[in-house]
Amino acid sequence: MIKIAVVQECAHENLSNNLEITQKYASEAAQRGCSVICFPECCLTGYRPDKAVCNAISLNAPALQQVSKIATENAIDILVGFMEKSDDSFHITHGLFRKDGTRDYYRKTHLGQREKTVFSPGKELKILSLTNGTRIGIQLCVETHYPEITQTLALRGAEVVFAPHAVPRISGNREKIWSKYIPARSYDNRIYMACCNLWDHARFGGGCLVTDPRGEVASACFDDKAFLLVCEIDEDLIASFRTLGNKRSAHFYPSLRRPELYE
């Protein structure tokens, strides 16, 4: 068993304040025995595509060096999101900052209709390894609506797929909407899905949800406030679906596909 944490937080256009929030919850998660903590989409810079030119940061920004320091000092891996400036383009990026000081980044590959007018899409679906060896994938917000992404990550070995969101309240009740499809992503691919959303009293609706490889809710909270949600991940349960000869392996559905029929 390992413990993961997901955060519902308020992140505005205040980098310093957002770093303090990162420090606060990373420390709490570490004290509660978590191996990794995941923050919502664009939690460092705030999610403001219309202000990407002003608020986006580069991969060598001091703020990201500070996140790396927080990970090291608290001995916990940290997943944080930000608007990234790279040369003449902008990306929606989520970084994995390991407690040993190493980093990896995932750039959102499937952009929303409005995001396309500002950001450039990433070019790769990545499998990343936590310090403890757990293999993870990342799907950012609207990307969770593409089953092919989750399936690809599962086939490449992902055990947990983190799904940081920046969804506004106007989009509807997050608990009801996620219940329609997030459990199916877990069940069909025999993985854990760990979702979290930005929150405030005006714009973002929040929500945290973790579903297990059986499609059951492992942990959830939709309180109208900032919070940290901790959940245990049963790696033996995941392995039981992927070990040949195990009675559950016949139900690792991605391995039974016939992709030649889909082309």
Place the predicted regions along the sequence by residue.
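CN hydrolase (nitrilase-like) catalytic-core segments centered on the catalytic cysteine
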Residues: 61-79, 145-226
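Extreme N-terminal starter segment of soluble prokaryotic enzymes
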Residues: 1-5
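Short polar catalytic/cofactor-binding loops
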Residues: 8-13
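Cys-nucleophile CN-hydrolase/nitrilase-fold catalytic domain and related Cys-dependent amidase chemistry
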Residues: 15, 24-103, 168-189
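Short, acidic/polar
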Residues: 17-26, 146-151
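C-terminal beta-strand edge segments of enzyme domains
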Residues: 127, 198-263
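Active-site catalytic loop in hydrolytic enzyme cores
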Residues: 85-160, 169-180, 243-248
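Residue-level detector of high-confidence beta-strand sites
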Residues: 105-108, 163, 220, 230
